Curated annotation (Swiss-Prot):
It holds the Pfam family CorA. Homopentamer. In the absence of Mg(2+), interactions between subunits are weakened, and dimers, trimers and tetramers can be observed in vitro. Homotetramer. The keyword Transcription regulation does not apply. One of its GO terms (cellular component) is plasma membrane. Mediates both influx and efflux of magnesium ions. Can also mediate cobalt and nickel uptake, albeit only at extracellular concentrations that are toxic to the cell. Does not transport iron. Alternates between open and closed states. Activated by low cytoplasmic Mg(2+) levels. Inactive when cytoplasmic Mg(2+) levels are high. It is found in: Cell inner membrane. Changing residue 279 to A/L/Q: Reduces magnesium transport by about 99%. Residues 1-254, 311-316 are cytoplasmic. The central ion permeation pathway is formed by the first transmembrane domain from each of the five subunits. Mg(2+) binding strengthens interactions between subunits and leads to the formation of a symmetrical homopentamer surrounding a closed ion permeation pathway. Co(2+) binding also induces a conformation change. Low Mg(2+) concentrations trigger both a conformation change within each subunit and a loosening of the interactions between subunits. This results in an open ion conduction pathway. In addition, this results in a less symmetrical shape of the whole complex. The lineage of its organism: Bacteria, Pseudomonadati, Pseudomonadota, Gammaproteobacteria, Enterobacterales. Inhibited by cation hexaammines. The record marks 253 as: Essential for ion permeation. This is Magnesium transport protein CorA. It comes from Salmonella typhimurium (strain LT2 / SGSC1412 / ATCC 700720).
């Protein structure tokens, strides 16, 4: 899908590209999974070649942040959650050339959707491609900050479930959610660090206007403040995971202790029963009239003795 926006009194307005309106006035050209015709149109009208899928997936720094005859290129991760609430990072290719911003992505992303909604009512300050790029990065960081807050809130709920130590379906679900939150936190951290690298490259390589230079530095400060919070999430997740494993081990030890006590309690009666169950011709007790009840009483006493001993030692 191809979308294009122009500036009117420092406000973004959408160009009707479906009606064959020229892209020449566009300050922002946004492409989501473009087909060959859309790629060809951008190439023919604006002379801009677009990154291929393998180039988007390349993770080397030299392939993600560079400058060539086609402009300044930045490939950056954006966080998203799919329809099944599975978290992921999707690469967006940014290119700035001749005062125009090109964005190429493989899916619709929350940060882009939120920025377009804001742009309808908010005017830009300087109205240039760099401000557009930084506004998108700013929106991304806000989204990541919200995601960190959501993880904190979820961890508080999980903490109460885990610390109660009552194992069951709710406990199993808490452990599964804990692993999922750890994965989300890792993806958020990757996105923050990638954005930090992208902004450092932009500050070094691009001749940013004064307003955008300060905006970039402000976003970098926001990232610096979020990274420790993100790190503390991993520590909290690790603590809760260890606590959960500790409670599980305690419960398992309790079960094993019960089996151990049962086996020890039944061992002496079993010894008595096996002794009198031996098939020998000369066994004096076989001729006793009270031999059988006496053996039963002896077996009961042999079982009670270790049980009472364990009870006295507080092993039960």
């Amino acid at each position: 899908m191809l979308s294009a926006f122009q500036l009117e009194k420092n406000r973004l307005t959408r160009l009707e590209v479906e009606e064959s309106q020229s892209l020449i006035d566009a300050v922002w050209v946004d492409l989501v999974e473009p087909d060959d015709d859309e790629r060809l149109r951008v190439q023919s009208e604006l002379g801009q070649s677009l990154a291929t899928r393998p180039e988007l997936e390349d993770i080397e720094a030299s392939a993600r942040f560079f400058e060539d005859e086609d402009g300044l290129h930045i490939h950056s991760f954006f966080f998203f959650e799919d329809a099944e609430d599975h978290a992921g990072n999707s690469t967006v290719a940014f290119t700035i050339r001749d005062g125009r911003l090109f964005t190429l992505r493989e899916r619709e992303l929350p940060a882009f959707r939120l920025y377009r909604m804001r742009a309808r009512s908010q005017a830009m300050v300087d109205g240039n491609a760099y401000e557009l790029l930084l506004d998108l990065f700013e929106t991304k960081i806000e989204q990541l900050a919200d995601e960190i807050e959501n993880i904190y809130s979820d961890l508080e709920k999980l903490s109460r479930v885990i610390m109660e130590g009552h194992q069951g379906d709710e406990y199993d679900e808490a452990l599964s959610t804990l692993a999922e939150l750890e994965d989300i936190g890792w993806k958020v951290r990757l996105c923050l660090m990638d954005t930090q690298r992208a902004l450092n490259f932009l500050v070094r390589k691009a001749r940013l206007p004064g307003g955008q230079l300060e905006q970039a530095r402000e976003i970098l400060r926001d990232i610096e403040s979020l990274l420790p919070h993100n790190e503390s999430l991993f520590q909290k997740v690790n603590f809760l995971m260890q606590a959960a494993m500790g409670f599980i081990n305690i419960e398992q030890n309790r079960i094993i202790k019960i089996f151990s006590v049962v086996s020890v309690v039944f061992l002496p009666p079993t010894l008595v029963a096996s002794s009198y169950g031996m098939n020998f011709e000369f066994m004096p007790e076989l001729k006793w009239s009270f031999g059988y009840p006496g053996a039963i009483i002896f077996m009961i006493l042999a079982g009670l003795a270790p049980y009472l001993y364990f009870k006295r030692k507080n092993w039960l």
